[in-house]
């Protein structure tokens, strides 16, 4: 056998036309669809040559679905379920301490992703201590050598390091909420900008119009109540820095809200806990506003969550692409899902589109920061060890159920869900079950008849996600040239990459010509164990010859392997974007601690761009008094109809708005309101014992916790001696 690989821009068209008559019998519409898809997708690949250094980021006409991955196994499933790119943490500096991955594992992920021309981004998005700069630089070189497509960066000191020409993306932690900030980062060398979640469509559009960088925006997942990079409450209270991936989630705790007169406005509510982001209704508007990378949050989420949410948005983006011939998918292949994606089936705290369309009063999940799921029925009767329930959907053993009792979620697992009959109510089927929990919660005994029941874990649905739940295949077309002395197979992928292999003869004339050609055609269409599907098959065979089936299969396998190798080599990897000349000047001359400058390289970067005075990051322990430990677009005055702008007839705010207080146990935080930009500042002070700890990353002994529950956080907050 002889193998030959042809590049996408080699100039080779289809090698031969199909034999007259045979082609007519086997013609399909798939070839036409292949051509239409190819025309939209192929452009960025045609400019990619081995000796031309590319700095290409996401093309302006491509839509990218970007999924999170805690580990490489989840990343692979995200790609199979339709992700055009995945973002994943490396062994360190990834802002998720419990979601680390070795470089060798990421290298294997890169090879897998590039088979679909999906991109792999690695997060280096913590702020770095001076002692960490060299380890970070070395890690970046390793990731570049592993083939990673881009780094997601928070610390701008990285821009001053000796790093390879890898594509850089500005993390949402860089706080990109103004046009001026976006333009600066664009001109400073970032290829992709992750905008603040708080922006509306008009603000997004303004940034997209004025920058060359690709615009990335969060479309689903948990919401940080603070502007990203503007939250220091975790470090102030526990010594764990959110800017370094150690957020203690103080925002999920219950608080009491008091006004300036000491009157209670809200008691023991989760007042800083946001609902989850869900932009599914706004996808078309976001496309029109210039968003090109659609990001799902969730690097701590499990496999089922990532599969479900990725599949859900894949289907919705595909719907947009079907109506927009000017746009194309950012990676290759077609995904088929073996389940019906449903965001309500996996963890969320309720849904909000936050500020994308308008400011809304109901963006908070004040009652509970946990997942209560969907209403499923009512509780009829509670016994000593079980309960009788009526549901609108069937239940299964293992389902997770819950009720809300005095603002507290009481959850339990249905160890046994025994059917007790079916009936109709208001024309709809109802199911009665005897449910025996694995452990009977005390709160259930306080329920009255017809108490609402919710299901937050559908056991059967979750089991379906544990199996193979999606398939992704790349389209290819075959051209087979059959002569007595040689059979040549050429496979061309949907991006236009080709590979040719040959089997030398001579071959004997087939006794049954028609059957022999049918056999060859069918064999080329049988790609079940590969990542491909055949869109078109052309045979050029003036005469049919006999070739053993085993040799045909071996040649087909060789062609597929050659095509895959050629496609991976043709993957259009981006590069470091050049800084503008002259370098951009930062629009501010003085940077406060809120700019998170934690090392000398970051100071050098800002000095080089015109900044004169730079305060150290909060983690440097130089801010010992009361300062904003959180800045947020979420306003509790607005949530409780206490905002002056909500008053009838008010067109502007001239009166000074009085502060309020947030109280949790012995912790008292002051709320100040900046009404012009509609922001709330949470004022607090770093605890004295934290000032005695080593600076994070300095090499001193400092306990690191990657994620902490609100309950565990309560145990870490020191109480004053009595």
Show the residue positions of the predicted features:
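Aromatic- and glycine-enriched glycan-recognition loops and surfaces
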Residues: 98-107
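Charged/polar low-complexity intrinsically disordered segments
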Residues: 4, 17-20, 54
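Short active-site loop/helix that positions an aromatic residue
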Residues: 159-164
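Short, low-complexity intrinsically disordered segments enriched in A/P/G/S/L with frequent Arg
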Residues: 11-17, 21-26, 30, 35-43, ...
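Surface-exposed amphipathic alpha-helical tracts and adjacent flexible/coil segments at the periphery
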Residues: 53-81, 85-88, 92-95, 109-110, ...
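Extreme N-terminal basic, low-complexity initiation segments
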Residues: 2-10
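Short, polar loop motifs at secondary-structure junctions
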Residues: 154-158
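Short hydrophobic transmembrane-like helices used for membrane targeting/insertion
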Residues: 1-2, 47
């Amino acid at each position: 056998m002889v193998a030959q690989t042809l590049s996408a821009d080699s100039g080779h068209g289809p090698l031969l036309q199909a034999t007259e008559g045979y082609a007519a019998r086997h013609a399909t519409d798939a070839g036409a669809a292949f051509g239409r898809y190819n025309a939209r997708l192929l452009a960025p690949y045609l400019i990619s040559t081995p000796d031309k250094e590319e700095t290409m980021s996401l093309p302006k006409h491509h839509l990218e679905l970007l999924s999170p991955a805690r580990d490489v196994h989840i990343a692979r499933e995200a790609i199979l379920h339709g992700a055009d790119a995945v973002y994943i943490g490396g062994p360190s500096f990834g802002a998720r301490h419990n979601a680390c991955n070795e470089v060798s594992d990421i290298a294997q992920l890169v090879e897998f992703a590039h088979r679909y021309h999906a991109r792999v981004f690695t997060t280096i998005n913590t702020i770095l201590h001076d002692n960490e700069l060299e380890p970070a630089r070395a890690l970046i070189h390793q990731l570049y050598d592993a083939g990673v497509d881009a780094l997601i960066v928070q610390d701008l000191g990285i821009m001053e390091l000796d790093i390879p020409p890898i594509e850089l993306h500005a993390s949402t932690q860089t706080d990109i909420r103004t046009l001026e900030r976006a333009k600066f980062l664009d001109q400073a060398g970032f290829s992709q900008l992750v905008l603040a979640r708080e922006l509306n469509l008009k603000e997004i559009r303004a940034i997209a119009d004025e920058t060359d960088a690709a615009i990335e925006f969060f479309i689903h997942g948990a919401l940080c109540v603070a502007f990203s990079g503007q939250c220091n409450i975790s470090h102030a209270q526990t010594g764990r820095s959110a800017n370094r991936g150690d957020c203690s989630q103080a925002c999920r705790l219950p608080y009491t809200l008091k006004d300036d007169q000491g009157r209670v406005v809200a008691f023991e509510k989760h007042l800083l806990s946001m609902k989850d982001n869900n932009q599914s209704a706004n996808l078309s508007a976001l496309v029109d506003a210039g968003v090109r990378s659609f990001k799902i949050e969730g690097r701590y989420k499990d496999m089922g969550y990532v599969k479900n949410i990725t599949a859900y948005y894949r289907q919705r983006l595909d719907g947009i692409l079907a109506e927009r011939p000017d746009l194309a998918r950012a990676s290759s292949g077609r995904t088929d899902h073996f389940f019906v994606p449903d965001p309500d089936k996996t963890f969320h705290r309720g849904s909000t589109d936050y500020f994308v369309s308008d400011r809304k009063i109901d963006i908070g999940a004040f009652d509970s920061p946990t997942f209560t799921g969907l209403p499923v029925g009512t509780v009829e009767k509670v016994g000593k060890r079980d309960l009788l329930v009526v549901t609108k959907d069937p239940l299964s053993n293992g389902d997770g159920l819950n009720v809300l009792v005095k603002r507290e979620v009481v959850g339990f697992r249905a160890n046994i869900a025994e059917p007790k009959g079916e009936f109709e109510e208001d024309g709809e089927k109802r199911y009665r079950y005897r449910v025996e929990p694995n452990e009977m919660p005390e709160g259930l005994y306080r329920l009255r008849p017809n108490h609402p029941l919710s299901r937050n874990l559908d056991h059967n649905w979750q089991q379906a996600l544990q199996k193979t739940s999606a398939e992704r295949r790349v389209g290819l077309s075959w051209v087979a040239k059959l002569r007595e002395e040689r059979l040549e197979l050429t496979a061309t992928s949907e991006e236009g990459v080709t590979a040719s292999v040959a089997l030398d003869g001579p071959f004997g004339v087939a006794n049954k010509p028609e059957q022999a050609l049918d056999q060859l055609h069918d064999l080329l269409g049988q790609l079940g164990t590969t990542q491909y599907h055949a869109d078109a098959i052309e045979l050029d065979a003036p005469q049919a010859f006999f070739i053993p089936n085993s040799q045909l299969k071996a040649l087909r396998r060789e062609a597929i392997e050659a095509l895959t190798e050629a496609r991976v080599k043709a993957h259009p990897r981006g590069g470091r974007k050049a800084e503008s000349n002259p370098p951009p000047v930062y629009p501010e001359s003085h940077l406060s601690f809120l700019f998170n400058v934690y090392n000398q390289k970051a100071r050098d970067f800002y000095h080089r761009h015109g900044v004169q005075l730079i305060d150290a990051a909060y983690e440097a322990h130089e801010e010992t008094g009361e300062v904003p430990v959180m800045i947020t677009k979420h306003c509790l005055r607005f949530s409780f109809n206490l905002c002056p702008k909500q008053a009838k007839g008010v067109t502007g705010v001239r009166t000074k708005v009085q502060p309020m207080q947030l109280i949790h146990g012995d912790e008292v935080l002051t709320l100040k309101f900046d009404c012009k930009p509609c922001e709330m500042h949470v004022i607090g002070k770093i605890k004295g014992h934290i000032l005695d700890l080593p600076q994070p990353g300095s090499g001193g002994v400092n306990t690191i916790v990657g994620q902490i529950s609100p309950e565990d956080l309560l145990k870490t907050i020191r109480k004053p001696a009595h």
